[in-house]
Curated annotation (Swiss-Prot):
Membrane topology per record: Peripheral membrane protein
Subunit structure as annotated in this protein's UniProt entry: F-type ATPases have 2 components, CF(1) - the catalytic core - and CF(0) - the membrane proton channel. CF(1) has five subunits: alpha(3), beta(3), gamma(1), delta(1), epsilon(1). CF(0) has four main subunits: a(1), b(1), b'(1) and c(9-12).
Protein name: ATP synthase subunit beta
Swiss-Prot/TrEMBL keywords: ATP synthesis, ATP-binding, CF(1), Hydrogen ion transport, Ion transport, Membrane, Nucleotide-binding, Thylakoid, Translocase, Transport
HAMAP family: ATP_synth_beta_bact (MF_01347)
Annotated compartments: Cellular thylakoid membrane
PANTHER family: ATP SYNTHASE (PTHR15184), ATP SYNTHASE SUBUNIT BETA, MITOCHONDRIAL (PTHR15184:SF71)
EC number(s) reported in the record: 7.1.2.2
Length: 488
C-alpha cells in the first residue's frame, strides 16, 4: 500500500493509464496528492501535439497511484506524460472582474474578451456555512410573474426548482426571471450552464447584451457572470461547473455582503455527469443506474446555497424530468432541498398557456398566512380549489356534456377557464416569438385581479380577453376591443 498522502505542491507524477476522461497517475512514494487536488498536464505528446489539461484527483488506488477525472478532452494524451500536483483544488476568479464575462469550469474566460483583471481566486470545494451564521427570517421574493407570485412564491435566499420535461419552457422561464430581477431588484446574478446546449448559452449571452444585463462596452456595469460546461464537454467539467458558478456567487455574498441570484440550468445534467464519472471510476450503480452517492453529491452543492447574516444567495434551478416522471431518483432527490417547486406541465403548453406552470402541482413553503398575509393566502387557496373543481368537472363534461352541469358548477367552470387564461402572461424575452410586449405584474395587482374573477365581477367579459395579458386593466381594455370588433 502507498503511504498516506501529504500536502505537496509541484510534485511530479507520470500518466500510467488513460481510459476516456479518466487517467491513472503514479507519484513518488509518500508524495501522493490529496483527493480533490488539481493535477496539471502540459507538454507535447510523441506526435508533436500540444497538450494542456487539468484533472481532479478522485481516488487513491494504492501502489503510489491516483485516479483523476479530466476537466477537458484527453485527445492526444499518452502514457508516460508528466502530471504536476498543484497542491490545491481547482480555483476560479471571483469578484467584480467576473461580471459580464463567460468562464469554463476552470475559471478561464472563453468569450474572447482578454484575460480577467482579478488576482482574487477561490477554491471550488468549500464547506457549507455554519448553522449559527444562517438567516432564518422568511421574506418573499417578487418575480413579476403572476402564477409564481400568487401560487408558489419564492423565498429570498431560498432554493427554487423549475421541473419539466423537454421543451416545456424551463430555459425561457429562467431567462425571464433573470430579466425581471435585473430590472426590478438590481443586484448581481451568476448563471451556471450545466450540460446544456451550446446554442442556448450563446442565445442567453446575446439576450443579456440586448437587455443591458451585460454591457459589452463597459463590463463593469454588467450584472451577471456566466459559467458554462456544455453538453459536448467531458463529464468532469459538467460535474464541477455548478460548483464553479456557486463559488463566484459565494464571494458576492460573503465578501461583498450582497444579495445574489444563482441560476443553474440544469441540475439533472449535474447528476447525469456524476453518474458518468461514478461508472468510469468503477463504482456499482444504484437505482435506475444513478451513482450510489447521489444524495451526497446533490447535498454538497445544495447546502452551500443559503442565506447568511451577511447576504443571501437565491437559487433558481432548472430540473429536467426524464420521461416526465417526477419519481425518478434525480428530481426526487432534488425536491428535498427546495423551498419552492415550479412544475411545468406539457398539457398546459399544448393548450398554449405560457408560462406552462401547473397551478396545482407547484408548491412553496412560503404560502402560509404568517408569511404572505391572509388576503394573499385566501386568494391563492380559492384559485387552487376553483381549478381543482374545474379538473373534476372536465370528467363529468366529457361523459354527460356541458348542459348537464348545475348553474353553480357552470359558473365555477367559466371562472376557472378565465383563471387558467389569466395565469398566462407575455414575456419580455419572448417578444420576438409572440410579437407582444412583456409584462411585469406587481403582487398587489395580481391578487386584486384574481379576487375580481373569483367574486364574479368579470363574469360578463369574454374568456379570450384574459389570455396573455398583464393586469386586470389590460383584460378590460382587451374585452372592449373584442366587443367593438364583434359589433363591427
Amino acid at each position: 500500500m502507498a503511504p498516506a498522502a501529504t500536502a505537496s505542491t509541484g510534485t511530479k507524477g507520470i500518466v500510467r493509464q488513460v481510459i476516456g476522461p479518466v487517467l491513472d497517475v503514479e507519484f513518488p512514494a509518500g508524495k501522493l496528492p490529496k483527493i480533490l487536488n488539481a493535477l496539471r498536464i502540459e507538454g507535447k505528446n510523441p506526435a508533436g501535439q500540444d497538450i494542456g489539461l487539468t484533472a481532479e484527483v478522485q481516488q487513491l488506488l494504492g501502489d503510489h497511484r491516483v485516479r483523476a477525472v479530466a476537466m477537458s478532452g484527453t485527445d492526444g494524451l499518452v502514457r508516460g506524460m508528466e502530471a504536476v500536483d498543484t497542491g490545491a483544488p481547482i480555483s476560479v476568479p471571483v469578484g467584480e472582474a467576473t461580471l459580464g464575462r463567460i468562464f469554463n469550469v476552470l475559471g478561464e474566460p472563453v468569450d474572447e474578451q482578454g484575460p480577467i483583471k482579478s488576482s482574487t481566486t477561490s477554491p471550488i470545494h468549500r464547506s457549507a456555512p455554519k448553522l449559527t451564521d444562517l438567516e432564518t427570517k422568511p421574506k418573499v421574493f417578487e418575480t413579476g410573474i403572476k402564477v409564481i407570485d400568487l401560487l408558489a412564491p419564492y423565498r429570498q435566499g431560498g432554493k427554487v426548482g423549475l421541473f419539466g420535461g423537454a421543451g416545456v419552457g424551463k430555459t425561457v422561464l429562467i431567462q425571464e426571471l433573470i430579466n425581471n430581477i435585473a430590472k426590478e431588484h438590481g443586484g448581481v446574478s451568476v448563471f451556471g450552464g450545466v450540460g446544456e446546449r451550446t446554442r442556448e448559452g450563446n442565445d442567453l449571452y446575446e439576450e443579456f447584451k440586448e437587455s443591458g444585463v451585460i454591457n459589452a462596452d463597459n463590463l463593469t456595469e454588467s450584472k451577471v457572470a456566466l459559467c458554462f460546461g456544455q453538453m459536448n464537454e467531458p463529464p468532469g467539467a459538467r460535474m464541477r461547473v455548478g460548483l464553479s458558478a456557486l463559488t463566484m456567487a459565494e464571494h458576492f455574498r460573503d465578501v461583498n455582503k450582497q444579495d445574489v441570484l444563482l441560476f443553474i440550468d440544469n441540475i439533472f445534467r449535474f447528476v447525469q455527469a456524476g453518474s458518468e464519472v461514478s461508472a468510469l471510476l468503477g463504482r456499482m450503480p444504484s437505482a435506475v443506474g444513478y451513482q450510489p452517492t447521489l444524495g451526497t453529491d446533490v447535498g454538497e452543492l445544495q447546502e452551500r446555497i443559503t442565506s447568511t447574516l451577511e447576504g443571501s444567495i437565491t437559487s433558481i434551478q432548472a430540473v429536467y424530468v426524464p420521461a416526465d416522471d417526477l419519481t425518478d431518483p434525480a428530481p426526487a432527490t432534488t425536491f428535498a432541498h427546495l423551498d419552492a417547486t415550479t412544475v411545468l406541465a406539457r398539457a398546459l403548453a399544448a393548450k398554449g398557456i405560457y408560462p406552462a406552470v401547473d397551478p396545482l402541482d407547484s408548491t412553496s413553503t412560503m404560502l402560509q398566512p404568517a408569511v404572505v398575509g391572509d388576503e394573499h393566502y385566501r386568494t391563492a387557496r380559492a384559485v387552487q380549489s376553483t381549478l381543482q373543481r374545474y379538473k373534476e368537472l372536465q370528467d363529468i363534461i366529457a361523459i354527460l356534456g356541458l348542459d348537464e352541469l348545475s348553474e353553480e358548477d357552470r359558473k365555477t367552470f367559466d371562472r376557472a377557464r378565465k383563471i387558467e387564461k389569466f395565469l398566462s402572461q407575455p414575456f419580455f424575452v419572448a417578444e420576438i416569438f409572440t410579437g407582444m410586449s412583456g409584462k411585469y405584474v406587481k403582487l398587489e395587482e395580481t391578487i386584486a385581479g384574481f379576487n375580481m374573477i373569483l367574486s364574479g365581477e368579470l363574469d360578463n367579459l369574454p374568456e379570450q380577453a384574459f389570455y396573455l395579458v398583464g393586469n386586470i386593466e389590460e383584460v378590460k381594455a382587451k374585452a372592449q376591443k373584442i366587443n367593438s370588433e364583434n359589433k363591427g
